[in-house]
């Protein structure tokens, strides 16, 4: 992924558009990637994927037939379907799915997804079943998170199969004014919003915790000049 840094940051931090501690990547449908905020050295620092890992759990569950209908109520989600469980980042349904899939199977999907940095230990989930929702001890980087979002946008393998296509529909934020597919994550000192919509893929990373989630969402949806939708 070739990164173009905005020399004068005319679209970024010098005008106060983005927080000083934000890292923001944006890639056009033509494949041009801009670093709108932050330093390039931040892109490859290992970080916890937080709840962005739930996309891997959802993909594996769809591919294995554990979830057949993304609009049907999902066990453990108190009546919500897979789409809303992803959007609200509910924990219980993904805990159940992770246990049903098992560490070896889920680790295989994690490796194929491109999200996780380094080799995935065979017993990565052993004794950490309730931490699988955020990848347990597995690590990602801002660059990898964004590359996955770009792969979603471009329909590149492994996301071009039936399960990958269903996942893309499950990631749709139906309340948004434009067709945006995204996933949030907040854990381990990272706040993520990553996904894609018309003409671009965007990844927003902020340091911190849950209180900064609304801020990250505002930046993300602001790249399409629309408000943050309600679930």
Regions from the PLM with identified roles:
Residues 3-12:
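Sec-dependent N-terminal signal peptides
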Residues 15-41, 193-197, 203-204:
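A short, well-structured edge-of-sheet supersecondary motif
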Residues 40-48, 72-84, 91-100, 129-137, ...:
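Second-shell loop/turn segments in exported
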Residues 42, 99-105, 148, 153-231:
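Structured C-terminal helix/loop/strand segments within mature extracytoplasmic catalytic/sensor domains
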Residues 46-69, 85, 145, 202:
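Active-site SXXK
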Residues 53, 62-79, 158-164:
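Short, well-structured active-site flanking segments
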Residues 56-66, 86-90, 97-105, 109-119, ...:
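Sec/Tat-exported extracytoplasmic proteins
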Residues 77, 81-82, 96-149:
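Mid-domain, small-residue-enriched loop/turn segments at the edges of structured enzyme/sensor domains
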């Amino acid at each position: 992924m070739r990164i173009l840094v905005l020399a004068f940051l005319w679209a970024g931090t010098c005008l106060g558009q983005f927080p000083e501690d934000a890292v923001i990547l944006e890639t056009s449908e033509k494949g041009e990637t801009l670093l709108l905020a932050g330093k390039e050295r931040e892109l490859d620092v290992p970080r916890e994927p937080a709840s962005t890992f739930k996309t891997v759990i959802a993909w594996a569950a769809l591919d294995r037939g554990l979830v057949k209908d993304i609009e049907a109520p999902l066990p453990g989600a108190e009546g919500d379907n897979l789409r809303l469980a992803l959007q609200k980042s509910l924990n219980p349904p993904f805990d159940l799915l992770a246990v049903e899939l098992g560490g070896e199977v889920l680790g295989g999907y994690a490796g194929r997804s491109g999200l996780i940095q380094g080799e995935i230990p065979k017993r990565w989930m052993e004794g950490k079943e309730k931490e699988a929702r955020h990848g347990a001890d597995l690590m990602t980087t801002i660059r990898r998170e964004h590359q996955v979002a770009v792969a979603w946008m471009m329909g590149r393998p492994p996301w071009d199969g039936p399960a990958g296509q269903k996942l893309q529909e499950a990631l749709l934020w139906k309340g948004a004014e434009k067709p945006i597919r995204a996933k949030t994550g907040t854990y381990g000192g990272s706040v993520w919003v990553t996904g894609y919509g018309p003409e671009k893929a965007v990844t927003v990373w902020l340091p911190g915790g849950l209180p900064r989630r609304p801020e990250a969402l505002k930046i993300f949806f602001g790249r399409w000049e629309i408000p943050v939708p309600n679930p």
